[in-house]
Amino acid sequence: MKFSIITLFPKIINSYIEESIIKRAINKQAIKIEIIDLRNFSTLSHNQVDDYQYGGGSGMVLMIEPLIKAIESVKTTKSIVLLTTPQGKTLNQSIVKTYANNYEHIIIVCGHYEGYDERVLDYIDDEISIGDYVITGGELASLILVDSISRLLPNVIKQESHENESFENNLLDHPVYTKPYEFRNKKVPDVLLSGHHQNIKKWREEQQVIKTLKKRPDLIDITKLNRHQLEIYKKMKGEQ
C-alpha cells in the first residue's frame, strides 16, 4: 500500500511516521509513505498557495491550481483521492476496512485555513472527517487515516491483534489487566489467573458485550454476535 500525503506541513507527517508501528511497517515494506509539499506546486512568489475568498469573509482559502497540480503529480489509475474536511463522512472502522481491502494507492489532501476552492471537489473521490469538531489542519486527520488503514494490511501487526481490537465485530474490546494482582483493594478477575483458556475466552466475550452495551450501545449488531454473546445481550437488555 502506498500513501501520498499532500500537506503544507511535511514535518508534522514526517515526525509521526518515524515512530512505532508505522515506522516498522515502512521498514518491512508493508507500506510506503510519500510526503508532498503543496508549496512546491505554487507559481507565485514566496510559494503562496492560498488567497482571500471571493465575496469577502475572514480566513484564507487554498487555491485550486497548486492542489490539482499536486494531485496529478502522483495520481494513477489505481489511486483514490481523499480530502480531509469536517464536511466529509465520519471515519469509522467499516470505511477503514474498505480502503485497506480495495486500494493500492491512497492520496490524502490535507485541508487547511478557511477551506479550499470548491472546484477542487471535482478531483476528489471521498471527503473524510474524523469527527464533529475543529482542528487546525488536516495533517492529524491524514495520520489517523494512515495509521488505521495500515493496521489492517498484511505484515503490519499480527492477525490476532487486530481481530481482538475494539470495533471488530462491532464490539468494544474486553478489559485487560497486568501486574500487580491487587491495587488498592481492586483485584484482577480470578478467571484470568485460572489457566482455563475456554473460561477465559467466555469471560472476555461476555465482557465485550457488557462494556459495549454500557458505553457504546449504538455499535452493537446482533447479527454479528455468537451464540454465547447473544445470550448475554438478551440477558442484559432484559435487566434494563
UniProtKB/Swiss-Prot annotation:
Predominant localisation class: cytoplasm
Gene3D superfamilies xrefs: 3.40.1280.10, tRNA(m1g37)methyltransferase, domain 2
GO cellular component: cytosol
BP-aspect Gene Ontology terms: tRNA N1-guanine methylation
Residues annotated to bind S-adenosyl-L-methionine: G111, I130, G131, D132, Y133, V134, I135
EC number: 2.1.1.228
CDD domains assigned to the protein according to its UniProt record, in alphabetical order: TrmD-like (cd18080)
InterPro entries found in the cross-reference section: Alpha/beta_knot_MTases, tRNA_m1G_MeTrfase_C_sf, tRNA_m1G_MeTrfase_TrmD, tRNA_m1G_MTases_N, tRNA_MeTrfase_TRMD/TRM10
Top enzyme category: transferase
GO terms assigned for molecular function: tRNA (guanine(37)-N1)-methyltransferase activity
Family: Belongs to the RNA methyltransferase TrmD family.
Annotated function: Specifically methylates guanosine-37 in various tRNAs.
Xref: HAMAP family: TrmD
Protein name: tRNA (guanine-N(1)-)-methyltransferase
Name of the gene: trmD
